[in-house]
Amino acid sequence: YDIPEPFRWDESFKVFYE
């Protein structure tokens, strides 16, 4: 998925992308 690196493993994104 095309998420910028600083946000890729942000907790809020991990909720959706794990």
Swiss-Prot record:
Cell location: Secreted
Q: What's a single GO MF annotation on this record?
A: oxygen carrier activity
Q: Quote the cellular component terms of the Gene Ontology held in the record.
A: extracellular region
What UniProt keywords are attached to this protein's entry? Iron, Metal-binding, Oxygen transport, Secreted, Transport
Q: Which domain of life is it from?
A: Eukaryota
Intrachain disulfide bonds: none
Function description:
Major yolk protein. This iron protein may play a role in the detoxification of free iron after a blood meal.
Similarity-based family: Belongs to the hemerythrin family.
Please report the name of this protein according to its UniProt entry: Ovohemerythrin
Q: Which organism is it from?
A: Theromyzon tessulatum
UniProt lineage: Eukaryota, Metazoa, Spiralia, Lophotrochozoa, Annelida
